[in-house]
Amino acid sequence: MTDSNFTIGFIGLGLIGGSIAKGIRRVFPNYTLIGMDENPDTIKSALEDGIIDSIATDCKTDFAECNYVFLCAPVQYNVMYLKDLKGSINENCILTDVGSVKEEIHLKIEELGMEEYFIGGHPMVGSEKAGFSFSSDRLVENAYYFITPTKKVSEQRVKDFKTLLKN
């Protein structure tokens, strides 16, 4: 997993998304990280800090080459982004989220026929603070990280995702 052609997309770079992105940047500095966030200050900071390499502006095109896409926005927004990602992510992409509740996103994944790509996730971390400025490259380190793969996602994808999380 040290391939410099490896690309990871993030939709939402708040406390959790920002922390995961910062951790991946620290461990895998050669990976390409693409970020999208509704807050222009957040996305500007992530780019200026070298956490992301480019800013995504369109879910339908900007995540097409990603090996992973992390949905790190609030749950109701993550569900909305799925429609845009359907048909645009590549066949090898692993799609995941970090939301604390799973029923709504799993139902939408099933409805859209995206089950072979999706592994739900939730790192058991948090802070009384919120936002990218409070994210840390070590926030999710050594934390419990629950995963909820669909029944149709392959064992290899689950194994690959667990490997990324362990690093």
Question: What residues fall within each predicted segment?
Answer:
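Internal alpha-helical scaffold of NAD(P)-dependent oxidoreductase catalytic cores
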Residues: 139-167
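NAD(P)+-binding Rossmann beta1-loop-alpha1 motif at the extreme N-terminus of oxidoreductases
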Residues: 1-58, 63-64, 68
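Rossmann-like NAD(P)-binding element
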Residues: 60-89, 93-94
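Rossmann-like NAD(P)(H) cofactor-binding subdomain of soluble oxidoreductases
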Residues: 83-133
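Short secondary-structure boundary/capping segments
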Residues: 1, 60, 87, 110-111, ...
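Hydrophobic/aromatic beta-strand patches that form the interior of the parallel beta-sheet core
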Residues: 34-36, 56, 96, 119, ...
